[in-house]
């Protein structure tokens, strides 16, 4: 469903969400046919994130999306802070539910020719004493410490599953002491037609590092 609606889900994303929160994925079914879905994933007791909220076009306007939404919020009722990314046409809906705009997310896309490499460029760059290395050359704990300083809330369980998933690659800006100064994950994604790549999370201390 998400692929059909141009969400471009990453390969393995649902698996990671489900393993982060066993009660975090909800679907609406009728006669063994999925009509809609929503992800409402607890990262920890104080923070959760909602995404993959979609209902098939021919089933919209029947209250399915609202029931999925209410079910997700009920499941997250004890969480202190809930985040989400809103499609432009859904901003009003979320504001009525009590959500406030925090920042604007810009989606950027690059189309590749069919004769180009099917795998992203993994050339490692160097700057000063900092080297860009693959995940295996730095400790997971170093990345988690960096992530905690730059994200709204700690998410060690989710982050471990996210970084170690077999789909895609992770690259880290590491200094000579083994500390993390930024990281990025690139993974294959499912486009409405064919496949592509998604980049994220992408955290860095400055534009040059990024």
Please provide the spans of the model-predicted regions.
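Conserved GNAT acetyl-CoA-binding A-motif
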Residues: 50, 69, 75-87
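Active-site rim helix/loop that mediates acceptor-substrate recognition in acyltransferases
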Residues: 1-39, 149-171
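Core nucleotidyl-transferase/polymerase catalytic module
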Residues: 26, 88-89
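Conserved acetyl-CoA-binding loop-helix of GNAT-fold acetyltransferases
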Residues: 52-55, 61-74, 92-96, 206-210
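N-terminal non-globular leader segments, chiefly Sec-dependent signal peptides
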Residues: 1, 7, 31, 43, ...
């Amino acid at each position: 469903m998400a692929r059909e609606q141009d969400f471009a889900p990453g390969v393995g994303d649902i698996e990671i969400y489900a393993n982060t929160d066993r009660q975090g994925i909800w679907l609406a079914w009728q006669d063994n046919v999925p009509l809609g879905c929503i992800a409402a994933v607890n990262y920890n007791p104080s923070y959760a994130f909602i995404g993959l909220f979609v209902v098939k076009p021919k089933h919209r306007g029947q209250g399915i999306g609202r029931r999925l939404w209410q079910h997700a919020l009920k499941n997250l009722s004890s969480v202190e802070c809930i985040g989400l990314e809103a499609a432009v046409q859904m901003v009003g809906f979320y504001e009525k539910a009590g959500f406030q705009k925090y920042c604007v997310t810009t989606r950027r896309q690059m189309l590749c020719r069919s004769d180009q490499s099917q795998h992203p460029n993994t050339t490692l760059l160097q700057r000063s004493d900092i080297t860009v290395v693959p995940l295996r050359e730095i400790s997971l704990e170093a990345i988690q410490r960096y992530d905690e300083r730059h994200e709204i809330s700690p998410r060690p369980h989710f982050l471990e599953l996210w970084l170690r998933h077999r789909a895609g690659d992770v690259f880290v800006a590491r200094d000579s002491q083994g500390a993390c100064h930024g990281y990025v994950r690139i993974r294959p994604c499912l486009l409405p037609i064919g496949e592509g790549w998604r980049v994220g999370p992408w955290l860095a201390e400055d534009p040059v590092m990024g």
